[in-house]
Amino acid sequence: MKHFLVLLCMALLSHLCADTLKIAVGAGYKKPIVEVLKAYEERGYGKIDAMYGNMAQIFAHAKQMEIALVIADKKFLEKQKELNFVNYQNIGTGIAVIAYAKGVSFDSIEDLTNEGIKSIAMPEAKKAIYGDAGMEFLNNAKFYDRVKEKLLVVATVPQVSSYVSTHEVDVGIINLTAALDSIDKIGGYIKIPQAYYTPIEIVAGSLKVCENDKACQNFLMFLQTPQMREIFVKYGL
């Protein structure tokens, strides 16, 4: 009897784990999504497993796991060939900024070319939304050839934020969400004029499994509530 109960508990646990909604989120949006998921669980709607990373990491995980939803830049989701999205729900607009370390004098985007700015961190363009936006900006503003020797390319936005916060680099190209999250640790930030990069539309992209998943559909509705919109606005979306 005891053996049977153990097997029954294991079966139930396995069933619960299998039914847990799994989502993937661009690393630059971890902070607001963590807050959203906390609110979702506190209201008794269930637990959601979320993984965070750059786009390459997300696509790799989504192919191996039953990911139902991906929260990221719509352009990245549309151009990749590995996953088939059936719907996109708007969450907000991403804003690219230049964050600078404490003690660094930085008043305009042109200051990137100053001799006083020795190092510029940014995420990798092929793997991260704001790396792509950063490269667009540097090329469109005709800065790239003048600053390419200063560039330090890393995998994710959080890495760039960390380097700026600890003054391992003078400035970094990140999103407004990350800059606001680190505002006490950095010197400040300047928004990159929208004219220099393609608009960034942050969406919840639904995969096929989401269509018939009640938990997934409920979460999508939850994302549209006024309380959740307030969270996204607070984090610069």
Where are these regions (language model features)?
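A short beta-strand-loop structural module common to alpha/beta enzyme folds
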Residues: 47-56
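Sec-dependent N-terminal signal peptides
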Residues: 4-13
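Exported/periplasmic ABC-transporter solute-binding proteins
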Residues: 18-43, 56-237
